[in-house]
């Protein structure tokens, strides 16, 4: 996924009200950015970090600039815009870069499914294959050399695990796809220390046949791309 035009840098002053962040540009201008990340953003929003932002040409937006990347003071790159994960996987599927998900001729997005009023991120279909339901999660929390999901208690994430497990029970294929959008993360684990119920449901879903895939990425102000498969820790 290319950033066009290229992202612009600023220094983070603070993030507040979950969806807003104040930054100062190299020219000394203070801007308020929109933040599309509803999580805790632990380690992704330290004052003094370099923020890379995009600018929308939509005149109706109150905050035209969006926080896309963080370049931390430890020299890690992080995509904090969680909306990008779905786009990255969609592009990778079109280019047949995810071996485990190759061979499908049709990709649908935001399709209603399940019994808890859910929408699946991606639905893969082909005449000779079982429908494949994919839920995409962005992983940005780095602790003790491991990436964890979630970074805060997530009732929505718990619901998605139940829905995926139900799809397997219905004879479908179900995949939980972790898009690792932090350059320092080399392995992934469910965050039992943050959301113990999510971790329990994760194990239940995995044992029921829900597939877990973890892929790393390359990140820079020109663009981001899913790259290599990463190991999953139990």
From Swiss-Prot:
InterPro entries: SfsA, SfsA_C, SfsA_N. This is Sugar fermentation stimulation protein homolog. It comes from Pectobacterium atrosepticum (strain SCRI 1043 / ATCC BAA-672). GO terms for molecular function: DNA binding. Pfam families: SfsA, SfsA_N. HAMAP family: SfsA (MF_00095). Belongs to the SfsA family. NCBIfam families: sfsA.
């Amino acid at each position: 996924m290319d950033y066009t035009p290229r992202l612009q840098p600023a220094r983070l002053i603070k993030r507040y009200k979950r969806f807003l962040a104040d930054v100062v540009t190299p020219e000394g201008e203070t801007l308020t950015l929109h933040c599309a990340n509803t999580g805790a953003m632990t380690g992704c929003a330290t004052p003094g970090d370099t923020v890379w932002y995009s600018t929308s040409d939509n005149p109706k937006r109150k905050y035209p600039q969006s926080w896309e990347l963080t370049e931390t003071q430890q020299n890690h790159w992080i995509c904090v815009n969680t909306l990008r994960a779905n786009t990255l996987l969609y592009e990778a599927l079109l280019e047949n870069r995810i071996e485990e998900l190759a061979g499908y001729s049709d990709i649908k997005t935001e399709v209603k499914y399940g019994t808890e009023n859910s929408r699946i991120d991606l639905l893969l279909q082909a005449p000779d294959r079982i429908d494949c339901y994919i839920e995409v999660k962005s992983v940005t929390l780095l602790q003790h050399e491991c990436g964890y999901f979630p970074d805060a208690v997530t009732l929505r994430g718990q619901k998605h695990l139940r829905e995926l497990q139900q799809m397997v029970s219905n004879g479908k294929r179900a995949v939980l796809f972790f898009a690792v959008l932090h350059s320092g993360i080399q392995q992934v684990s469910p965050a039992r220390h943050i959301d113990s119920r999510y971790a329990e449901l994760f194990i239940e879903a995995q044992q029921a046949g829900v597939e877990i895939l973890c892929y790393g990425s390359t990140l820079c102000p020109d663009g981001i791309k899913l790259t290599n498969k990463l190991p999953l820790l139990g």
